[in-house]
Amino acid sequence: WPGASEFAQRYQTKFGKKPTYHAACSYASMMLLGETAAKTGNDRKKLRDALASQSWTGIMGDVKFENYDGFTQQNKHEMAVIQYQNGASVVVYPPSRAKAKAVYPFPGWK
Protein backbone atom coordinates (compact mmCIF):
# COMPACT_ATOMS: atom_id res chain seq x y z
CA TRP A 1 0.00 0.00 0.00
CA PRO A 2 1.16 3.56 -0.60
CA GLY A 3 3.75 4.70 1.91
CA ALA A 4 4.06 1.35 3.73
CA SER A 5 7.67 0.68 2.70
CA GLU A 6 8.74 4.23 3.51
CA PHE A 7 7.04 4.04 6.92
CA ALA A 8 8.79 0.75 7.69
CA GLN A 9 12.19 2.16 6.67
CA ARG A 10 11.77 5.33 8.73
CA TYR A 11 10.59 3.33 11.74
CA GLN A 12 13.55 0.93 11.42
CA THR A 13 15.98 3.85 11.23
CA LYS A 14 14.49 5.64 14.23
CA PHE A 15 13.87 2.69 16.56
CA GLY A 16 16.33 0.06 15.31
CA LYS A 17 13.67 -2.59 14.74
CA LYS A 18 10.86 -3.40 12.35
CA PRO A 19 7.49 -1.80 13.11
CA THR A 20 4.82 -3.92 14.76
CA TYR A 21 1.24 -4.12 13.55
CA HIS A 22 0.28 -1.82 16.41
CA ALA A 23 2.86 0.80 15.40
CA ALA A 24 1.62 0.81 11.81
CA CYS A 25 -2.03 0.93 12.87
CA SER A 26 -1.38 3.81 15.28
CA TYR A 27 0.55 5.75 12.64
CA ALA A 28 -2.17 5.21 10.03
CA SER A 29 -4.90 6.27 12.48
CA MET A 30 -3.14 9.48 13.46
CA MET A 31 -2.34 10.36 9.84
CA LEU A 32 -6.00 9.90 8.89
CA LEU A 33 -7.22 11.93 11.85
CA GLY A 34 -4.59 14.64 11.31
CA GLU A 35 -5.38 15.04 7.62
CA THR A 36 -9.10 15.24 8.33
CA ALA A 37 -8.71 17.68 11.25
CA ALA A 38 -6.50 19.93 9.11
CA LYS A 39 -9.37 20.21 6.61
CA THR A 40 -12.23 20.60 9.09
CA GLY A 41 -10.64 22.72 11.80
CA ASN A 42 -11.91 22.67 15.39
CA ASP A 43 -15.54 21.91 14.50
CA ARG A 44 -16.28 18.46 15.99
CA LYS A 45 -19.39 17.91 13.87
CA LYS A 46 -17.51 18.66 10.65
CA LEU A 47 -14.72 16.30 11.75
CA ARG A 48 -17.18 13.52 12.57
CA ASP A 49 -19.11 14.01 9.32
CA ALA A 50 -15.90 13.99 7.28
CA LEU A 51 -14.70 10.79 8.95
CA ALA A 52 -18.09 9.16 8.35
CA SER A 53 -18.36 10.12 4.69
CA GLN A 54 -14.88 9.92 3.19
CA SER A 55 -12.40 7.16 2.37
CA TRP A 56 -8.61 7.01 2.47
CA THR A 57 -5.79 4.81 1.26
CA GLY A 58 -2.71 4.62 3.44
CA ILE A 59 -0.07 2.28 4.81
CA MET A 60 -2.71 -0.12 6.21
CA GLY A 61 -4.79 -0.18 3.03
CA ASP A 62 -8.17 1.33 2.30
CA VAL A 63 -10.18 2.93 5.11
CA LYS A 64 -13.91 3.64 4.88
CA PHE A 65 -16.10 3.75 7.98
CA GLU A 66 -19.47 2.07 7.55
CA ASN A 67 -22.21 0.24 9.41
CA TYR A 68 -22.59 -3.52 8.89
CA ASP A 69 -23.74 -6.63 10.76
CA GLY A 70 -24.98 -4.57 13.72
CA PHE A 71 -21.69 -2.69 14.12
CA THR A 72 -21.46 1.05 13.54
CA GLN A 73 -18.69 3.14 11.99
CA GLN A 74 -16.30 0.25 11.45
CA ASN A 75 -13.53 0.02 8.87
CA LYS A 76 -14.66 -3.04 6.94
CA HIS A 77 -11.72 -4.09 4.82
CA GLU A 78 -10.12 -7.17 3.35
CA MET A 79 -7.54 -8.81 5.54
CA ALA A 80 -4.29 -9.85 3.91
CA VAL A 81 -3.38 -13.52 4.35
CA ILE A 82 0.34 -14.27 4.37
CA GLN A 83 1.88 -17.68 3.78
CA TYR A 84 5.55 -18.63 3.97
CA GLN A 85 6.66 -20.17 0.69
CA ASN A 86 10.28 -21.15 0.05
CA GLY A 87 11.37 -19.21 3.13
CA ALA A 88 9.68 -15.94 2.17
CA SER A 89 6.40 -14.41 3.35
CA VAL A 90 4.00 -13.99 0.44
CA VAL A 91 0.52 -12.45 0.24
CA VAL A 92 -1.90 -15.15 -0.97
CA TYR A 93 -5.23 -13.36 -0.29
CA PRO A 94 -7.12 -11.23 -1.30
CA PRO A 95 -6.77 -11.95 -5.01
CA SER A 96 -6.26 -8.25 -5.78
CA ARG A 97 -3.08 -8.23 -3.64
CA ALA A 98 -1.93 -11.85 -4.00
CA LYS A 99 1.64 -12.41 -5.18
CA ALA A 100 1.22 -16.21 -5.28
CA LYS A 101 -1.45 -18.89 -4.93
CA ALA A 102 -1.92 -20.45 -1.52
CA VAL A 103 -0.30 -23.84 -1.04
CA TYR A 104 -2.96 -26.18 0.32
CA PRO A 105 -3.01 -28.59 1.94
CA PHE A 106 -0.12 -27.52 4.14
CA PRO A 107 2.95 -29.48 3.00
CA GLY A 108 4.42 -29.77 6.51
CA TRP A 109 7.49 -28.30 8.14
CA LYS A 110 10.95 -29.23 6.89
Question: Which role fits each region the language model picked out?
Answer:
Residues 1-110:
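Extracytosolic ligand-binding ectodomains
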